[in-house]
Structure formats: C-alpha cells, structure tokens
C-alpha cells in the first residue's frame, strides 16, 4: 500500500462520500521520495482542490509520511507538462506557512492544453461546458450503479445530543418540539421550522433530532444536510447526469433535516427541486425539519409557495439565552471539559458576552486555556485580562436609568410613564421590556429593579421577564425590538 493509499483512507473519513468521490478520487498523486505531485486535471480543479482541501491533504500526508516533504499541485492529468505550485513542509516549517510558487515546464517549449473529453451521454450544452470547467471525462463520472457508496448530505456529529443542550426560557419550546419529532417523526409538527440568530443552537437541536431518532429507530433513513450542500448535491447530480438518483435519495428519506434553508432563496432550480422534494415527503408522512436565521415570511426572495408550506407545521424560535441560562451553559461546558470554573467567573463572562452561544463558549475556551497555560485558576481577574479585547469591558456598567431612557425614546413615551401606574398597552409593554432588559443587562436584584420602576414588587418583575421571554418566541415584532434595544444599550 502506497503512502497516498493510506492517506486516502484517512481523508475519506473526513468527507462525505459524494464529496470524496467528486473531488478527491479523480486526482492522482505521484510520490518520488519526499516529493508528492498532485495531478488535478485542469487549473480550476487545481485551485479548488488546493483552496478547499489543501490543508487536509498536507496534514494527512504529514501524518502518514512525516513532516519533511514537498507537495506539488499540477493543473494537468498524470502525464506530460506540469505547471505546479510547491508547498514545502520541513521539520521547522509552520503548518500554515506561505507557499512558494514554482513554474515547471517539462515538455520542451509546448504550451498546448489537452482538451477534456466530453461524455457521449450528454446532448446538453450546459453539461458539456461544466465538464470542460471541471475536467471530468467519462471514466470519472460517478453513478449509483457504478458505486454503492454514492451518497448525499452530511454526517451527523455525535456530540450534538439533547443531553448536552442547555435548556432555558429562550429555547425550551424549540427543544420540546425537537424532542417530540425525534420520537414520533411525521406525526406532529411537520415541518418543524426553527429560526433564530447565528450561534444560538439551531444546528445543535437539528442534529440532536437526527441522532436521537436514530437511537429510537436504527432502521430509519435520516438525511442531514445544509442548504449549501443541498445545492451542491443538486448541481453535481446535473453535472453527473444523475438527477434520478438525487431525487430517489432525498425523496426516500424518513427524516430530512436541512440547516440554513434561507440560502435556497433566489436559486430557482434548487428551490423548485426542494419544493417537489418537500411535497413528496410531506404527502408520504415523512418528517421535515428546517432551520433559518429568519421567520419564513421574512426570508427575502423565498417563493410564496414555500413560505406557505413552511407554515404547515410548527414554527419556533431560539433566542439569546438569559443571564441564568448563559451561566448554566458555561458551567456545563467547563464540566464537560473537565475544568473547574468558579461561579463568579462564569457570571462575569455571561454578563459581558451577550451576542450568541458560540461566542460565549469561545470566550470560555480562551479563559480556560489562558489560565491553564499560566498555571492559574480561572478567576475573574484572568477573565478580565484575556477577554478585554473580545468583550470590550467598559469601566461603567449599564444602569437602569439608561435602559429606561433608551426604551422610552424607542417607543416615543416618557421615562416617567415607565415608572407610573399607567396600565395601557402602549405603556405596559415597553415597561415589561425595560424590566426584562434590566434583568438581563444589570446585576441588580429583582427587588432593586422593581423599586427603580415605581416601587413595584419583585414578583411583577418576574412576571414581566417571563412574559417578554414568551412573547419573543411567538411575536417577531417584539423579538426584533428586543434585540435592537439590546444592541443599542450594550454599545
């Protein structure tokens, strides 16, 4: 077995089968001592391989062969002249070191480029041009009949399970619905549409559905993908003349999960294919789960017929977790990593990182790594020092009176209206929002917040926080207002 054969086995584990067959299998790698030449068939193919898979190829060859090596990327098939880019990786070379470019011409003075063969199967002008672009000939075409491993979609990640998803008021409805469809797919909430900002746990919930459904029914056919991969699969099925297989695979799923569905908006061919796929699955009682960064009606360029179908089932939101949930997320994450995190440090990070869960966990990792490297406990002082440029710690904390002023200006009412006894909706709702913001953005206790709003009882503040949290799940207008106010006050 050659070094490259060993590498292929490792690379295959890191890619979807379809991606592996489309991009990695067609290339040829020749080894001459420490020199590895990667033949990529044409310039476009070479650039794509190098930009998307270059680091994976380099690290895998280093793992199988050692660090002292040279990699050449050729834009030709395995013969004749070569135009190559050379990557040198020695014992002291940085993994992400700058590549040097070397032009080699080993075919005397000729610069003739061999034309790729065009499949006799296709009479389509578009397909022929795509063949010329990608450099595929008939021998490279992959069909389900020729290869049983031909597949679509993306692998589910085992780490995304319901047990590792921290539940709070901002996501409990979405989590409950996700659990229901994983146990009884196609029965309730079909489709299940989960929307919310980036990094708030939509992908986690979606993959948790797939992983749990597989535990409940190991024989279920579950396809997980995102809109980018769905588009790639569709385009590749056209290029490889295998649309029937694309349709057969996607329309035979028991559970179809598509992340970031908003990106199919404006892509007419893909949107139409998805429309028919949706109808086929829905009519057969198969479960569909979709995520998006926006409510269906707010996705610009999305066809009305798709918007209406997304409304067939249940639409739920995931919002930024409140302070208590953010603290719980940090403590659980630290525990999962086998690290001790003081409650006060978790509270400090949670109070200062309010963008999304992804950045919250990133801040935690930075604190834990810094403290471990410096052989110190992860104290507030350590967090303050290493996160200063990330969270832009302000010397003055947000004050309740500032929140009241911003909210009053936003809703065009007076600050004294917020502290008054008026109960009209145009006053009561902004007051509840201001209380909820005060609870999230300040360290004041419930009684202190109530006192700042005209001497109200702490139970009134609790009711306001719960009411606004619930409304943010179902009312996009209030949810958008809240996020906008949150950003204004946090600046």
Swiss-Prot record:
Residues 372-491 are annotated as: Domain IV, binds dsDNA. It comes from the Bacteria. GO terms for cellular component: cytoplasm; plasma membrane. Residues 1-69 are annotated as: Domain I, interacts with DnaA modulators. Domain I is involved in oligomerization and binding regulators, domain II is flexibile and of varying length in different bacteria, domain III forms the AAA+ region, while domain IV binds dsDNA. GO terms for biological process: DNA replication initiation; regulation of DNA replication. Belongs to the DnaA family. Plays an essential role in the initiation and regulation of chromosomal replication. ATP-DnaA binds to the origin of replication (oriC) to initiate formation of the DNA replication initiation complex once per cell cycle. Binds the DnaA box (a 9 base pair repeat at the origin) and separates the double-stranded (ds)DNA. Forms a right-handed helical filament on oriC DNA; dsDNA binds to the exterior of the filament while single-stranded (ss)DNA is stabiized in the filament's interior. Pfam families: Bac_DnaA, Bac_DnaA_C, DnaA_N. ATP binds at residues 199, 201-203. Keywords: ATP-binding, Cytoplasm, DNA replication, DNA-binding, Lipid-binding, Nucleotide-binding. SMART domains: AAA (SM00382), Bac_DnaA_C (SM00760). This is Chromosomal replication initiator protein DnaA. One of its GO terms (molecular function) is lipid binding. InterPro entries: AAA+_ATPase, Chromosome_initiator_DnaA, Chromosome_initiator_DnaA-like, Chromosome_initiator_DnaA_CS, DnaA_C, DnaA_dom, DnaA_N_dom, DnaA_N_sf. Residues 69-154 are annotated as: Domain II. It comes from Francisella tularensis subsp. tularensis (strain WY96-3418). The keyword Nucleotide-binding applies. It is found in: Cytoplasm. Residues 155-371 are annotated as: Domain III, AAA+ region. The lineage of its organism: Bacteria, Pseudomonadati, Pseudomonadota, Gammaproteobacteria, Thiotrichales. Oligomerizes as a right-handed, spiral filament on DNA at oriC.
